[in-house]
C-alpha cells in the first residue's frame, strides 16, 4: 500500500514505515502530523485518484527532527565589469516517519 501526498508544493510517494525529507513544517520534534492532501492511494492493487484530492484519505506521521540540506553556492558575475556576487544557501527540511495511511 502506498499513497501520493502533497506538502510544501511538492508531491511524495510514501509507504508505511518510510522516512522522508519534506520541506520545513511548523511542528515540534516528536509530535505527530497529518497530511490531508492525498492525491492517490494504491490499496491491494486498486489505485484510486482524487480530483484533485481524496476527501476520505489521510496520512499520519511522526516528526523525527529538523535540519538543513547541503550548502548550494550561487555565483553571479558580469563579464568585464569586475562585479562578483557569491551567496550560499541551505534549504531547511523536516524528517518525518510515515506511520499510517488511512484510506
From Swiss-Prot:
Tagged with keyword Ribonucleoprotein: yes
GO BP terms, alphabetized: translation
Any one annotated GO CC term: ribonucleoprotein complex
Domain of life: Bacteria
KW rRNA-binding (keyword) present: yes
GO molecular function: rRNA binding; structural constituent of ribosome
InterPro entries cross-referenced by the UniProt entry: bL21-like (IPR028909), bL21-like_sf (IPR036164), Ribosomal_bL21 (IPR001787), Ribosomal_bL21_CS (IPR018258)
PROSITE patterns from the UniProt entry: RIBOSOMAL_L21
Keyword list, A-Z: Ribonucleoprotein, Ribosomal protein, RNA-binding, rRNA-binding
Family the entry assigns: Belongs to the bacterial ribosomal protein bL21 family.
Role according to the record: This protein binds to 23S rRNA in the presence of protein L20.
Subunit structure: Part of the 50S ribosomal subunit. Contacts protein L20.
Protein name: Large ribosomal subunit protein bL21
Natural source organism: Ruminiclostridium cellulolyticum (strain ATCC 35319 / DSM 5812 / JCM 6584 / H10)
